[in-house]
Amino acid sequence: VFENSAAIRGQKRTPGVQRRGQERRRAILDAAEALLAEQGYEAATLKAIGERAGIPTASMYHYFPDRHQVEAELLRRHMTELDTRITATLEKPEAQTLREAVDVMIDILWDYYRAHRSCTELWFTGRHQMLVELVRSFDDVQAERLWRHLVNRGLASADTPRLAVQLSFEVGNRLFDVAFRRTPQGDGATIDEARRLITAYLESYS
């Protein structure tokens, strides 16, 4: 009887405990985002994140084993938002040419990166293998979607290989990296060169 009563009391506490745990995880991610945006990648240590969130370092390990787990979770959050924006754009296409389609995709990414410096810090400065794999997976998914979109709408030749769009994302990443190393808002001249390079490359299959 006593065991059953204790179990019931434990079950009643569970939703509250879970809610507090979720709130703390959000607080940690928000603190990490703020530190990355204000002070850069190197400053966003697990200790600094905990201090910003008001959570003792020892307690931080209950939610995230190390800073890389925090970074990965925060990057996933950014990727979810980016995916939502890309999906909305592809579902209501306005681009009438390949160049316009390339511009639209670049603008989505550029606008988001400029508004979320923490994302650029993780995407381009963070070199942990976990982040690298997340970026690669995201790019592969988006490249597949964009390739189908371009071919289905006749904006790219049906002979355009999927690999060409995948490589375009790879090149785009490198040029975005250069652009944001040049200026905090992303160097416009470098972005313009990215537009020309990627468009010319994909048009070569026409």
Regions found by a protein language model. Name each.
Residues 1-23, 206:
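N-terminal intrinsically disordered/low-complexity leader segments
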Residues 24-27, 31, 142:
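N-terminal positioning helix adjacent to the helix-turn-helix/winged-helix DNA-binding module
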Residues 27, 35-69:
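Helix-turn-helix
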Residues 28-36, 78, 82, 109:
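Short hydrophobic clusters on alpha-helical segments that form packing/core surfaces
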Residues 74-101:
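Amphipathic alpha-helical linker/stalk segments
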Residues 80, 84, 100-115, 129-154, ...:
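Amphipathic alpha-helical packing segments from all-alpha helical-bundle domains
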Residues 121-125, 132, 153-198, 205:
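Hydrophobic/aromatic-rich alpha-helical bundle segments in the mid-to-C-terminal region
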